[in-house]
């Protein structure tokens, strides 16, 4: 491990188009090969589709989707005396949000659909309605933590 000081966390600035921090984080997760404008266009198009289909505010729906996909606990591997235990641990809010965004993007990419904007819009609408793969992944993570509750005393 490095002996230097840990890098300072830079503040996430709100997205210029939507004036929302989560939107900035989502653009960063969507971006491939440094193509930020493409990622911004995908998110903007997805929000347009959401507004078209539901008639509600896409930013509100997006925030609900992220909240519904955010895990509260996770399991982490811990070696104790030659055995590896899956130890349930609480997830910090920042990490939980990052995990939710990662899952939303990954499951959007693996969906069937025309464009990435269509796939992302579909996944966000599903997550906002407590359905979809990202929410299922959160439930799975919570079940794993519940099943391994006996090893909670190994927390570090």
Swiss-Prot record:
The keyword Aminoacyl-tRNA synthetase is annotated on this UniProt entry = no
The record's gene field reads rpsG
GO molecular function terms listed in the Swiss-Prot or TrEMBL record: rRNA binding; structural constituent of ribosome; tRNA binding
Q: Which organism is it from?
A: Prochlorococcus marinus (strain MIT 9211)
Which UniProt keywords are listed? Ribonucleoprotein, Ribosomal protein, RNA-binding, rRNA-binding, tRNA-binding
Q: How does it assemble?
A: Part of the 30S ribosomal subunit. Contacts proteins S9 and S11.
State the organism's lineage.
Bacteria, Bacillati, Cyanobacteriota, Cyanophyceae, Synechococcales
The name on file for this protein is: Small ribosomal subunit protein uS7
PROSITE patterns assigned to the protein according to its UniProt record, in alphabetical order? RIBOSOMAL_S7 (PS00052)
Q: Which family does it belong to?
A: Belongs to the universal ribosomal protein uS7 family.
Pfam families associated with the record: Ribosomal_S7
Q: What does this protein do?
A: One of the primary rRNA binding proteins, it binds directly to 16S rRNA where it nucleates assembly of the head domain of the 30S subunit. Is located at the subunit interface close to the decoding center, probably blocks exit of the E-site tRNA.
Looking at the UniProt record for this protein, which Gene Ontology cellular component terms does it annotate, in alphabetical order? small ribosomal subunit
Q: Which InterPro entries match?
A: Ribosomal_uS7 (IPR000235), Ribosomal_uS7_bac/org-type (IPR005717), Ribosomal_uS7_CS (IPR020606), Ribosomal_uS7_dom (IPR023798), Ribosomal_uS7_dom_sf (IPR036823)
Against HAMAP family, the record matches this protein to: Ribosomal_uS7_B
């Amino acid at each position: 491990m490095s002996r230097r000081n840990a890098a300072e966390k830079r503040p996430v600035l709100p997205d210029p188009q939507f004036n929302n921090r989560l939107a900035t984080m989502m653009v960063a997760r969507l971006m491939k090969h440094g193509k930020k404008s493409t990622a911004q266009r995908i998110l903007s198009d997805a929000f347009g589709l959401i507004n078209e289909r539901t008639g509600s505010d896409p930013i509100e729906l997006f925030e609900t989707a992220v909240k519904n996909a955010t895990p509260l606990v996770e399991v982490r591997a811990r070696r104790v005396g030659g055995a590896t235990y899956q130890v349930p641990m609480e997830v910090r809010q920042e990490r939980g949000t990052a995990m939710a965004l990662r899952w939303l993007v990954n499951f959007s990419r693996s969906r069937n659909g025309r464009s990435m904007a269509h796939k992302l819009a579909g996944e966000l609408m599903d997550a906002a309605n407590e359905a979809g793969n990202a929410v299922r992944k959160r439930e799975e993570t919570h079940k794993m933590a519940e099943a391994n509750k006996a090893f909670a005393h190994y927390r570090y």
